[in-house]
Amino acid sequence: MHAFLGNAQLPSTPRGDRLEFSEWYAEVLRSAEIMDVRYPVKGMYVWLPYGFEIRQRVVEKLRRKLRETGHEEVLFPTLIPETQLKKESEHIAGFEDEVYWVTHGGLKELDEKLALRPTSETAIYPMFALWIRSHADLPLKIFQIVNTFRYETKHTRPLIRMREITTFKEAHTAHATEEEAEEQVKEAVEIYSSFFDELGIPYIASVRPEWDKFPGAEYTVAFDTLMPDGRTLQIGTVHMLGQNFARTFEVTYETEEGDQEYVYMTCYGISDRVVASMIAIHGDERGLVLPPDVAPYQVVMVPILKKGVRRKILERAAEVEEMLREEGVRVKVDDRDMSPGRKFHYWELKGVPLRIELGARELEEGTAVVFRRDELERETYAFEELPDVVPELLEDIAMELRKRAREKFEKGIFRTDSPEEARRLVGEGIVETGWCGSERCGVRMEEEFGGDVLGTPYPEEDTEFERCPICGETAEYTVRIAKTY
C-alpha cells in the first residue's frame, strides 16, 4: 500500500463541532487518501486509489439499478459545438457563464468554438432525432457516466463544488406520451431513493421553485441531504422536460396512425456529491465510517504477532481470510511490520467496517476479537463462528448507519410559522413553513430568512400551515428553506 500523502494521521479537528466541519472534511479527504487537492488547476482534484475504489463501488451500485430498470449505457463526446449548445436559449442561459470553451486546435483557431460538456442535453438530443423514427422505438432510456466541466466562481471544494465533476451520471429518456414521461419521473425518484437508502444517506425530495428549476425543464424534483454544519447539499435531480427540447431539436416519432408527434422527455443526474455526503454524514473523530456495500475492504485482519507462534498466527489469519472470501466478504490481512496500535488507527481512519484481531491468546482459545467501526466496540467470537457472524455484522452495521443518520437528519428539520424563528433556525438545518405560492413571497423569504428556497415536498402533500409568513395570505403549500452549498 503506497502512502501517497505521507503517514496517515487521525483528524485533529473534532467532527462533532459543526463550526469546524469544513476543516474536518478537508483533513479526512487528505488523511484517508480519498483525494489529492494539490493539482495545479483550481477546482480540479486527483482521485487516489482508496477513494477511487469507493467511487467505483458507488457507481456500480447505481449502474446496476439503472440496468435493472431498462436503461442502456452510452458514451458521448466531451465537446459540443457552440451552435448546438446555444440552440435551446432558456437552457444555455442557465449555464453560459460557466462554460469552458475550446477555441484552437493546435495553433489554428477553430471555425466554431467547442464547449467542454457542462451537461449533455444539447449533445444527446440531436442524436435522439436520428435514432427515434416510430412509436416502436419508444421508450428510449439511456445513461452515461462522464466528466462534466463548469467554471464555478464560488468557493470550490473537493467533491462538493468542482470545476471538473468527475462522476456525473446522467440519464435521458424519450416517451410517446406525457403520462409515460410522468411515470418515468416517478421511476427515477424511486431509483434514487433506493440508492440513497442503501448508502444510508437521508434525504428530502422537493419540487424546486420556478426560479430555481433546471433550465428548459417543466419542473425539477431535487434530493437534498443535511451536512453536519447545518447546510443542505443537493445530491440528485430529476427533470420533467416535457416537449421543450423535443421541439428545439426536432425529436419526433411516427404514431400508429401515421402522424408525426414530438416525444416527451425526462433527464436525471447524480454526481460526486454522493461520496461527499456519505463521508460527511457517517464519519466521526477517527475518520471515515463506510457502509459495508461500498467499502474497499469490509474486514481487515490484524495479526498480533508474538515470537514462537508467529507462523501459526499468520496461518490462522490465512484460514480466516479464506473462510470469509468464500462467503463473499472483501478481506485484507495487514501483516506489515508495524505495531498493532498503529494499524488499528490506520484502518479506523480508512473506515473499514470490521476489524478482526488475532493473537497468541486467540490462537490458544480458538477465538477472534471483532471490532465494529460504527460502535467502536469489541466482541469475542469462536473461530468457527466467523463465516456466519461476519456477514450478519456487516448487514447490521449497514442498518445501524441508516438508522443513526436518519434520526440525526430528522432532528435537523424544523417546522414553524414564525418569521423570527425561521430566521434563527435556517442556519441550523431545514426550515418548513407555509407559502402562498407566489414567487415574490418565495424570493422575500430567501432575503429575510437568509437561506434558499428548496421547494415544496415531493410527492405533493397537504400543508399543515395556515398562513404565508410573508404576505399573510392562505398557505397553499409547505415550503422548505435552508442554507445550501
UniProtKB/Swiss-Prot annotation:
Pfam families given in the database record: HGTP_anticodon, ProRS-C_1, tRNA-synt_2b
EC number annotated for this UniProt entry: 6.1.1.15
Quaternary structure (record): Homodimer.
Compartments (UniProt record): Cytoplasm
CDD domains (alphabetical): ProRS_anticodon_zinc, ProRS_core_arch_euk
Domain notes: Consists of three domains: the N-terminal catalytic domain, the anticodon-binding domain and the C-terminal extension.
A GO BP annotation: prolyl-tRNA aminoacylation
InterPro entries associated with the record: aa-tRNA-synt_IIb (IPR002314), aa-tRNA-synth_II (IPR006195), aa-tRNA-synth_II/BPL/LPL (IPR045864), Anticodon-bd (IPR004154), Anticodon-bd_dom_sf (IPR036621), Pro-tRNA-ligase_IIa (IPR002316), Pro-tRNA-ligase_IIa_arc-type (IPR004499), Pro-tRNA_ligase_II_C (IPR016061)
Highest rank taxon of the organism: Archaea
Keyword terms of this UniProt record: Aminoacyl-tRNA synthetase, ATP-binding, Cytoplasm, Ligase, Nucleotide-binding, Protein biosynthesis
Function in brief: Catalyzes the attachment of proline to tRNA(Pro) in a two-step reaction: proline is first activated by ATP to form Pro-AMP and then transferred to the acceptor end of tRNA(Pro).
Catalytic activities: tRNA(Pro) + L-proline + ATP = L-prolyl-tRNA(Pro) + AMP + diphosphate
GO molecular function, one term: ATP binding
Official protein name in the record: Proline--tRNA ligase
Location (main, coarse): cytoplasm
Family: Belongs to the class-II aminoacyl-tRNA synthetase family. ProS type 3 subfamily.
Residue ranges of coiled coil: none
A cellular component term, taken from the record's GO annotations: aminoacyl-tRNA synthetase multienzyme complex
NCBIfam families tied to this protein: proS_fam_I
